[in-house]
Amino acid sequence: QQEFIDLKFLYVDSDSSVSYNPGFVTTKENLSSRIFKSIETYSKSPDINSFGGRLKYSKLLSVIDKVDTAITSNITVLKMRRDMVPAYGQLANYELCYANQFHADLEGFNIRSTSFKIAGVDGDVFLTDLPNSDGLTGVVRFFTLVDDVPNFINNNAGTVDYVKGEIILFAVNISSSSVTNKIEIEVIPESNDIIAKQNLYIVLDTTSGSKLTLLEDLVSVSYTHLRAHETHE
């Protein structure tokens, strides 16, 4: 008898700062478009799109670098995201598995979420984490923002297992969320090589979750002008 697995998506958001020599590209917009297209092509490759797929960080960097010889460097930061579907208006527990180890900065804020509302609490609520001193486990904390400063309203809203890559929320009555029908929960991975384990399927998000910043490499521009000057002497 065939067993049907409840497939869950593990989204990977990328934030890339790409330096380039503007003397070698037609327009900044054209370069940006080609970089996004290359990332999108990689996102659909068999490496990622399969059970047990793996997002290879070095491959992603290479994909960006190879778009144009004008690119001089790129710094790319990855984050993992699961979308939690709340049982609105009901007291419910939640479990989110990422199956990849979380980074555990002892100051916390390794986990971030979009906002939601809790019955009986005024204002928008967010969740984050605070690791225990061993960095292996920790707690989930709920907070609101007062003048852009976190105001913690629950310091024991759940547990975090940084090694397993697992978040558990204790019983909570979520009444609404800022994003339709879901709460996006983003985590910093310990390794930038992200593997689809268990019933997870990796999606390299090339839409709203990912960012691209293009920076003119002034050093390479100066070098190019210098070489051109030397050539004409």
Which stretches of residues belong to each language-model region?
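Carbohydrate-recognition loop of C-type lectin domains
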Residues: 1-51
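Structural beta-strand/beta-sheet cores of well-ordered domains, especially the beta-sheet scaffolds
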Residues: 12-14, 53, 107, 114, ...
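An aromatic-glycine-centered, glycine-rich loop/turn in mixed alpha/beta architecture
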Residues: 30-123, 127, 203, 222
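Extended, beta-strand-rich, solvent-exposed assembly scaffolds of outer structural proteins
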Residues: 46, 124-180
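Polar, low-complexity export/assembly segments characteristic of proteins
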Residues: 85-97, 157-202
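Acidic/polar low-complexity flexible segments
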Residues: 194-221
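Conserved small/polar residues in nucleotide/adenosyl-binding loops
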Residues: 224-231
